[in-house]
Design a protein with these regions (language model features):
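Sec/Tat signal peptide C-region and signal peptidase I cleavage site
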Residues: 2-7
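Cystatin/cathelin-like cysteine-protease inhibitor module
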Residues: 9-179
Length: 179
């Protein structure tokens, strides 16, 4: 005698195929968003920026930083930022190169409830005079990763990584200095 085979049964038989497809697409979009956030967190990227932006006349600028507070590894880091900036903007006159934080921003990366790695980041800002027209404010990031029990490693292209530069007209520069 042959045993009957069970066919695939939809759990939600009261929904039409169109509704089931929409549910599937919604779940897929949620999964993709979570994966994107996880990858962004791992790389130190987020949609909101770093929270150091100021809006003037509808334009978002990074804040101007002129005080170096980071002394751990800063000499070499500042030199690397200065060198890269000078290559990118040879006509600009560098005013300051600073890391405006006291230590590395360090976070633990988790998979569920298990810590899988650590990451740390420091931001470097280069401010330069752009002729008589205004200023250039550039941000670089230094990032490192470490698995538990291992040494810090630097992902390729992140020592330093050029993140962004703002061209700032003189009139906006004066307003940014006050913020």
């Amino acid at each position: 005698m042959v045993a009957p085979l069970s066919a695939q049964v939809y759990k939600e038989v009261d929904k039409s195929p169109k509704e089931r497809l929409q549910d599937f697409l919604d779940e897929t979009a949620t999964g993709i968003n979570k994966a994107g956030k996880t990858i962004g967190d791992f790389l130190g990227i987020n949609a909101e920026g770093t929270g150091d932006e100021v809006k003037i006349d509808g334009v978002k600028y990074m804040r101007i930083h002129t005080s170096n507070l980071f002394y751990a590894d800063s000499t070499d880091m500042l030199t690397l930022c200065r060198k890269d900036f000078a290559q990118r903007y040879p006509q600009a006159e560098i005013v300051s190169v600073v890391i405006p934080q006291r230590s590395w921003n360090q976070t633990a990366l988790k998979e569920g409830s298990k810590i899988t790695a650590y990451k740390r980041m420091a931001l470097c800002y280069v401010l330069a005079k752009d002729g008589k027209d205004g200023y250039i404010n550039a941000r670089y990031s230094f990032r490192q990763l470490r698995n538990p029990g291992k040494r810090w490693t630097t992902p390729e292209g992140y020592w330093p990584r050029f993140d962004r530069a703002d061209a700032i007209p003189n009139v906006h520069y004066e307003q940014l200095k006050l913020k």
